[in-house]
Amino acid sequence: MESMESMSEYYQRLVRQWAVDRNLIEGSTPEAQCVKLIEEYGELACGIAKKDEALIKDSIGDTLVVCIIMAAQLGSDSFSIDKLVFERTALDVPDVSEKIVVRGATELGAISYFINVTNRDIDRCIGNIYALCDTLAEIAYLHKWSLADCLIAAYNEIKDRKGRVVDGIWIKEGD
């Protein structure tokens, strides 16, 4: 870890290198990563519906990994979850996780839209990736985790994972 680097910055850098090593930045497309993003976010919604804490934490981390990869593909060298600040005042109401997940799905739709349009609006797409990560931060906060906790857990899960890239999407061995 570099001297002034936060723990989450360190793990974001490791995730970017992991993606480079597997040719997911240059050898994949934002469209392919968007499919992976939808998959991981769907797992998060499933975890919340089932109230499965382990799946929720894993899915937050996995979704962050894909967001970091997409931001790198789109050329955002400055993307960092450390830049997120969200309002925690309205988070003490019952069933708020479901409301937050639905709001995040709106951001997911916006990301999909900006990835799919002919003249990509990269800045708006990155803005929606940040907004989705902010949603993840809110859900993590409700479960008493930080985004860094979720990212570190996800990285430790994937760092030595074997697999292959199929049509620009990382498929772990055994899937």
Regions found by a protein language model. Name each.
Residues 1-175:
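Flexible "arm" and connector segments at domain edges
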